[in-house]
Amino acid sequence: GVEARIELQPLIDATATGDTLQLRAGHYTGATIDRSLSVRGQGRGTIIDGDGRGTVLRLEAPSITITHLRVTGSGRNVSKKESGIWVDGSASDATISEVRVDDSGFGIWVNKAVRPLIAECDILGRNDAAIISDLGNGIHLFNVRDAIVRDNDIAQGRDGIYISNSTGCLIEGNRVRRSRFAIHYMYAHGNRVIGNDTDSTSVGIALMYSKHITVRDNQVRHGRTHGMLLRNLYDSRIEGNVVQSSKDGFFFSGCYQDTLQANWISANDVGIQVSDSKDNLLVANAFIENANQLVYEGYSHVVWEGGDEGGNYWSDYVGWDRDGDGIGDKRHYPSDIASYLVGRFPAVRL
């Protein structure tokens, strides 16, 4: 039989502001938290279950902490934003740590709140919808300032971490698997994406219609469509990333004044595909054994060398380094007639 549910709401209501509600292992119903308090479970045996209806846990006051428990069974209506945990705009300075979220529409949705911390959570999205748009994102930040999303493990669902209309956010040290886009920025400025690890997604990191983004020391592997998708990205720095074994390592479209520096781009079908972009600096990157190193489409202007940093390393470079300075003496023009043909006639790519 089904284990009897313990009503969580009366326990919340009986907890004073500033106190900690300690939940032993057991099966609890969903609740709304409307005052500043902490809820601490005993690990995954402390289960808060929405039984497939609505949002499971709603945070509606500042300085709430949720830790060491499992949240499961929200409703599945993503158009109604049904989520495992909903962080309301009134819930500034929320902390959600070491929480498992599964079998939900969205995992954690932060809506217009400031300074949330989401750390060391394990979020398993669904994978049972006929179309991906019927699935929710693992962590969803909408109109959020100064979020820290750190060291979470996210799999399945639509996008792993989705950030829109948000500023000052740090997305660091997360691991995302088997989602559509692992990390997806839309209309989000002044954010950092550092030291994340993505694998087996359609796109590893997607930065769209955004500016002043720093993307550093990430590892992106097995992007079925793109490793990194940069579209209408402005004045951003992409440095020290490893992008491997994807269809395109980088897909670069409509981008201006961005710097790609010291990235390791290897074993992709195409190292970098560039279209309709200008005034971007690509320097000190290593292009290693991509089937096509570079494909141009449309008009693009790329500065390939930047003063003291030197040029880029190409594994297929043919030339001499007579003066022994480690930089080839003959300019390498990677966009040869073959990649021109590939861009114009995709079937050429054999």
Predicted segments — roles?
Residues 1-14, 316:
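Right-handed parallel beta-helix/beta-solenoid
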